[in-house]
Amino acid sequence: MAAETPAVSVVVPTRDRPELLRRAVTAILEQTYQGPVECLVVFDQSDPDLPWAELPAGRHLVLIQNQRTPGLAGARNSGILAATGELVAFCDDDDEWLPEKLERQVARLLATPSAAVSTTGILVRYQDRTTTRLAPTELVTHRQLLRSRLTELHPSTVLARRRQLLDEIGLVDEQIPGSYAEDYEWLLRASRHAPVLAVPEPLAVIHWHQSSFFSDRWRTIISALTYLVDKHQDLEAEPSGLARIYGQIAFAHAALGERRPARSWARRTLSLNRRERRAYLALAISLGLISAKTVTRLAHVAGKGI
């Protein structure tokens, strides 16, 4: 096998979204990348079922069940452990790669031996609007990720060296409630070892829609973010980053109609960063000035999350 085209294993967790899954898998199998591509579809809490008429040369489709903790994190880990490629990539079942994604990303990762993990820019598609999102720098440090989630480093664009993933970074955390923010938690660990290489091209389409599994799970979001802060205490070294998470917790409480905790968390947020907009949004929602649903929709139209 040529060193320039190592085998890539792509892990696609899925649950009850067959049409979206077929779109994602088609984009993976039709990559222009010249090396072998193994597409591992991991069925979470469902039976493997994805008939495929014919595979392109050098492409392999493997269907497995999640044998670990039910949910996204366990399914992703089941795929990682079953992967045979030198490189491991992630793709959510409702997203799709552009044809040259792997070709360009693998080349950049191989040209940057100090990097173990790479991402690419994204095209966020919500309803009839598409927004381009690129990381602020090509090498994203741990400190930058403490300060900001950087949505541009989307899990559907992750490409990692399998050995470093298993030996240094570790698997996805299956204890985080509802698998919410499991990608951010994993990136925090990855960036401790080396900066994350962010290819400055939008090479994946990220679809935001009402069937997204985290669109309305406010209680889970509160639990997961609290878990994240407890686990990564170095967040306290970056007040603006901690304020962002506190603001998300405040917003979630406000969305649930829990005015007292929403205002309490908003005050904690503003004590760290008076410019954190999520605190003001949480206060506005708690006062009945606007609904959480409206705020979320407007953010998505702009290609942003809460």
Feature map (PLM): residue ranges:
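Cell-envelope/extracellular polymer assembly enzymes that use nucleotide-activated donors
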Residues: 6-9, 38, 185
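Short, acidic, metal-binding catalytic loop of nucleotide-sugar glycosyltransferases
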Residues: 26-36
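Acidic helix N-cap motif at the loop->helix transition within catalytic regions
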Residues: 47-55, 96, 100
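Flexible acidic/His/Gly-enriched loops in nucleotide-sugar-dependent glycosyltransferase catalytic domains
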Residues: 58-60, 74, 102-170
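Glycine-rich, basic loop-to-helix element that forms the pyrophosphate-binding segment
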Residues: 66-83
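Short aromatic/hydrophobic "clamp" motif used to bind/position activated sugar donors
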Residues: 88
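Conserved nucleotide-sugar donor-binding catalytic segment
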Residues: 138-219
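Catalytic core of nucleotide-sugar-dependent glycosyltransferases
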Residues: 206-209, 214-241, 259-272
